[in-house]
């Protein structure tokens, strides 16, 4: 099966996809000072804890449990030259703030990076209210939006770094 597996496949460790994404975000932020992280009071839970420890305020913004505000603030920051990564559970972003994503980010083609964490069915004790299956369909329907779904932590790490350089709106789905 030569050529089908990555050269380092034996060295891959079991790591949460969002942890890999969070590490990639830190690497991207070290090279790109305009990268900022926003969340709806979920910084640690969505994998941004390492970013928060290294950069803190003003590059780390907790907007409260207000996902509509989360993406609207991110859009405003992008309009001023920042590269915002706005994260929440996928059930709430894009689940609760789809209209704001459409209007303030996509129609204006702002380079906001939306991170939908805890996507899918495996959300533990949180149950059906936190499950999100429709996020890819919702986000693919938006103009200018790039939709990404990494397969493992290493891919997620590289994806975060690539997203920081992309000048389009992005959505990444993290399990």
Stretches with model-predicted labels:
Residues 1-174:
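Thiamine diphosphate
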């Amino acid at each position: 099966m030569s050529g089908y597996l990555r050269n380092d496949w034996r060295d891959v460790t079991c790591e949460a996809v969002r942890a890999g994404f969070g590490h990639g975000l830190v690497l991207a932020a070290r090279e790109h000072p305009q990268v900022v992280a926003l969340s709806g009071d979920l910084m640690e839970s969505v994998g941004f804890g390492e970013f928060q420890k290294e950069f803190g305020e003003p590059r780390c913004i907790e907007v409260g449990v207000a996902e509509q505000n989360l993406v609207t603030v991110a859009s405003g920051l992008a309009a001023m030259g920042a590269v915002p990564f706005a994260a929440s559970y996928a059930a709430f972003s894009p689940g609760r703030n789809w209209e704001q994503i459409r209007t303030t980010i996509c129609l204006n083609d702002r380079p906001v990076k939306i991170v939908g964490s805890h996507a899918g069915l495996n959300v533990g004790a949180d149950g059906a209210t936190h499950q999100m299956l429709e996020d890819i369909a919702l986000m693919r329907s938006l103009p200018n939006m790039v939709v990404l779904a990494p397969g493992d932590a290493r891919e997620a790490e590289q994806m975060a770094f690539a997203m920081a350089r992309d000048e389009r709106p992005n959505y990444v789905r993290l399990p």
